[in-house]
Swiss-Prot record:
Chain's gene name: hisC
Stored Gene3D superfamilies: Aspartate Aminotransferase, domain 1, Type I PLP-dependent aspartate aminotransferase-like (Major domain)
EC numbers: 2.6.1.9
Name of the molecule in the record: Histidinol-phosphate aminotransferase
Annotated positions of the N6-(pyridoxal phosphate)lysine modification: 219
Catalytic activity: L-histidinol phosphate + 2-oxoglutarate = 3-(imidazol-4-yl)-2-oxopropyl phosphate + L-glutamate
An MF annotation (GO) of this entry: pyridoxal phosphate binding
Keywords: Amino-acid biosynthesis, Aminotransferase, Histidine biosynthesis, Pyridoxal phosphate, Transferase
Lineage: Bacteria, Pseudomonadati, Pseudomonadota, Gammaproteobacteria, Moraxellales
Species of the source: Acinetobacter baumannii (strain AB307-0294)
Stored SUPFAM superfamilies: PLP-dependent transferases (SSF53383)
Biological processes per GO annotation: L-histidine biosynthetic process
InterPro entries xrefs: Aminotransferase_I/II_large (IPR004839), HisP_aminotrans (IPR005861), HistidinolP_aminotransfase (IPR050106), PyrdxlP-dep_Trfase (IPR015424), PyrdxlP-dep_Trfase_major (IPR015421), PyrdxlP-dep_Trfase_small (IPR015422)
Disulfide bonds: none
PANTHER family with a match to the protein in the record: HISTIDINOL-PHOSPHATE AMINOTRANSFERASE, HISTIDINOL-PHOSPHATE AMINOTRANSFERASE 2
Family the entry assigns: Belongs to the class-II pyridoxal-phosphate-dependent aminotransferase family. Histidinol-phosphate aminotransferase subfamily.
Amino acid sequence: MTVSTAQMRFWSPEVRELEPYVPGEQPKIQNLLKLNTNENPYPPSPKVVEAVQAVLHEQADALRLYPDPDATALKQAIAKQQNIDVSQVFVGNGSDEVLAHIFKAFFLQDEPILYPDITYSFYPVYSQFFGTKTKEIPLNESFEIDVRDYTQPNGGVIITNPNAPTSIALSLAEIEQVLQANPDRVVVIDEAYVDFGAESAVSLINRYENLVVCQTTSKSRSLAGLRVGFAIAQSHLIAALEAVKNSFNSYPIDRFAIAAAVASFEDQAYFEEQCQKVITSREKLVRDLTELGFNVLPSKANFIFATHSQHDAGQLAQKLREQGIIVRYFNKPRINQFLRITVGTDEQNARLVQTLKQDIL
């Protein structure tokens, strides 16, 4: 939508300066192979479907009532699955909302927060929105984080692990180095993709009072359409997030989403099976693309980050699009020759590889 300067006079000065996040494309194309937004290629647990249907058919009258503002059943399910106390769980309308509350609750400091120069592109948006000072720390030439860079004075640290979009993961030992170097600042580990092979920092929660771990049900639990995210931390940090949430929206998660997420956490076997299928497919996709001349960064996510020395990434993305395959291209410094490709089913990955082999490369 185009808005004229005259119309913008109704906007606040802060909003006029905002550079909003641009979500991944959701095109309406027939026979589209969508590998651009890291959605799970498999459906949620059948128990999730049953739970949603139960709300509709057995609890329909309850839809006239507000949902539980604390989403107690969901917090209990998460706490049980993670082997932590309910007081250590915060839930929100997707991890993006949880992250926004984290920025408001912990990062308004006099010194800049630290995050990598290549990271989840919502972080600069939140920083601008909340007026948070920032300092971007360059990844090294291998696109890895050097944790020694995060020992300098700061107003907080946020790291995506595994990194998005590079897919490279830190070890728990490296995360501990960052935590130990910042005892008086909150360190946030954004684990949207952790279930596909990385180490979760949740195991460190009881040892570090400055740690917040943020996760989502969108990727590994196939619930991107229902918007459920959560944070795990010691109770004094959770209390701050609850205060922020209840100053914005006391009912962020609806009855359907609560029921679906609870069912997902209760079906651990299905969850583990689907994660392993994605991991296995990822390794085969990496081998296939490597044989085609791609350099693929080591991935612990449900996507890969790949470049080809003989082909421009932007042109590759456009040629794939012409063949009905959408991948994510970032026209940004340092990564403008890479494609981020979501891991699909084996059949979907085979279509991608065959299209590259026969029609593009």
